[in-house]
Each structure stands twice: as C-alpha cells, then as structure tokens.
Amino acid sequence: PQMFGLRGQAVHRAASGWSPVYVQQVAADPQTGGEGEDVELGVMSVGFMTPSDDDALIWRGPRKNGLIKQFLADVDWGELDFLLVDTPPGTSDEHISLVQLLGKTLGPDDGAVIVSTPQEVAMLDVRKELSFCVKTKLRVLGVVENMAGLTVPVTGLGFRDGTGNDATEQAISMIRERCPELLSLSACLDIFPPANGGAQAMAESFGVPFIGRVPIEPALARACEAGLRALPGSSDVMAPIVERILRQ
C-alpha cells in the first residue's frame, strides 16, 4: 500500500467477492515517451486488513495458504492483462501454494522473475529459488540484478576532510576553479561488487535469461516513499527492465 500511495485504504466485500483497491496511473506512450492512456491497477494486500500498519501477522502455514487462495479465487479482479504476485524471499509455504494454485492456469508466457542483489550471501538464497522453479517446472522469465551500483553527479557528492568535517563547498569550488569539466560528469560506485560474476553469471549457470541491472536510484526510493511511480523530472530506471520482461 505504501508504494502505491494507498495507505489507509480498505478492501470491501461485494456479491462478486472482495473488491481490490484501485490506483489510477498514466502509462507512458511507447512511441513518443510522453503520457499515454490511463491504466487501472488493482491492488490486494494483507496490509489493507490489519488494524495498524505496525501490526504483525503471526500466522502458521495453513492460515497463510488460505489467504493466498482467497486472494486468487475470491477477489473480483475483473478482466486482467497481467497478474503480478510479489512474494517474500526464499522458498516457503507461500511459493508452494502459489505454484499449486496457479499451476493449471499458467500459460507459455507466464513465469517468475527472480530478483537478486550481486553479493554472494544474497545469491546463495536466490540459487535455491531458481532450483525451486526447476523442480516445480515453473518457467523463469529471467533474473534481474538489483542495487547494481550507484551513479551520482559530481555536483551531488559530499566531501569530508581528513578529520571527518564537511568539505563539500571547498571541494566543489576547487573543482570549478581548476577542472570545471569534471562538474558535468557522474561518479559510478560499485556499492556491492558482484561476486563470481554476479547475477548474470548465476543466470547463465541455470540457463535462464539475464534481464538486466537496476542501479541504486535515490529518486526511485523517494518516489516509493511518496507512493509515486517516479518523481517528476527523474529518469525511469525500471522502464528498460519492464520492456525486456514484456518481450519474454
């Protein structure tokens, strides 16, 4: 709910089933890059059902599985173009239930998108998820590497001196005076250096497509905090990834 700007909303039960909470968004025109048609996105989350955002759900497997079944069978989704299910990390009851409940309805274009960060400690778990997909015969549409580096304009960097005090203003002034062309560049940092080839090598070892990398994007994080798809004027770092997934 937070990422869609839907905190405080509630689901309602009608004769046809639960009604999802809808958010109106404007899709980008793939030809011009400008605004296209309005799209209606239905959202269903257990977050709509708790008395408080801070409440924990202390449920065992059978109860969680029952709720997943209700979300799939008892929600009046209407006619869908896509059904996206965001699952927790790992291979748990939720994943098994989803595969069992959706298994017979999955077509040749359906499957899982696996997301990993480039560190080995993360990929250890993600390899288990890929193995799960192989054993359950769930198609893997591809692997995405998240948090793949950070790009910051030089003018957006902070600087400190040897004692830890802020020296940003002095550093920028020195650059402007001695090498002003640097101010038009960006600094690229590998916050989490890829281990053993990162997610791309992992995808290749399992014989599944590597979709691409998503950098650490502060503007995207701020957009999620504000419940927006993207902040006005910021680049849409997810657009290339979405396009590649749709082509799978």
Please give the residue ranges for each predicted region.
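Residue-level signature of catalytic and energy-coupling elements of molecular machines
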Residues: 44, 68, 86, 126, ...
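Phosphate-binding loop that captures ATP/GTP phosphates
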Residues: 1-50, 65, 192, 200
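Conserved nucleotide-binding/hydrolysis micro-motifs of P-loop NTPases
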Residues: 9, 49-51, 89-91, 118-122, ...
